Amino acid sequence: MGDVIHTLPALYALRAAFPQAHIGWLIEERWAELLCAPGASRRGARSGLRPLVDEVHAVDLKAWRKSLFSISTWQRAATVWNDVRDAGYEVAVDLQGAMRSAVLARLSGAGVVYGAAEPRESPASLWYTRKVVAHGRHVIEQNLSVAEAIAQEKVAVPRVEFPIDPFPVDLQVEDRIARDLAQHGAGEFALLNPGAGWGAKRWPAERYGEVARGLAQAGLCPLVNYGPGEEDLFRAVLAASGGRARPTKGSITELIALTRRARIFIGGDTGPLHLAAALRVPVVAIFGPTDPARNGPYGTRRIVLRSAESVTSHARRAEAEEGMLGIGSEAVLRAARELLGMV
């Protein structure tokens, strides 16, 4: 999720530079709702249901790998790839910097393939026809520098911005979320997200529970977002909150609608944090092994908490990072109160 969201300002800049261009996006199926509302057409004139791109090409690589030798898998892959090539793209842009994405960009049929000169995975650059020396410390700024090269005009870093609410608006989902919140007395709420991609980035669930308890005492309903396989994580938060925390989980479209209404978001370096930042929701970001200067929340009011003892690493360790354990729940509550104007 985060990689997609970090690309949106670059897309916004390209759309501004080429307002009449047909822009498509090749994306994993599980993240397609960030670009197009469920059930909406994935190609054609842009609308509130698909506001930024003219066409969404979704691939389900995870499922395809599980049934690699199935005829139906190859048929689905061929259908997607025929759609990509039939679109007649002249330029492909790889902002992920992975071998997989670079190869797909080269095979798209586009005559020109842009990418960073020093991508995330070094061999990816072998597939680019034009390599851009990316500048800027934050990944959003680095992505924008590639867009600058394509547009051949300067898009200054201070102008880096997300389009105002860049995500699809499904009115039925929006109405349902609003009704559900009202029915459960959660008109004023904080959204907490204790999960993360791997254990080293995960602040202890018990401390999220303590934060939830403090927010409830301050008059905010603490809603806890969690995904499949994170049920035990929520139960630990609930227990530590003294029963104050309330669960919420659902589709990406539902998470977007919920996040739009949050007073504040609290979580670590994970997709929902960057979603909240893109929606300009104030965030308290709890960082450990990843560098907030490169991967932190961007474009919103924020307080980033990171211990001086944390060491930048992308090793996917299961145990919590030592420096992150030095951040107490009271520090998070102080940051939340500051952003909420409660001090």
For each feature predicted by the language model, list its residue ranges.
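Catalytic machinery of carbohydrate-active enzymes
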Residues: 1-343
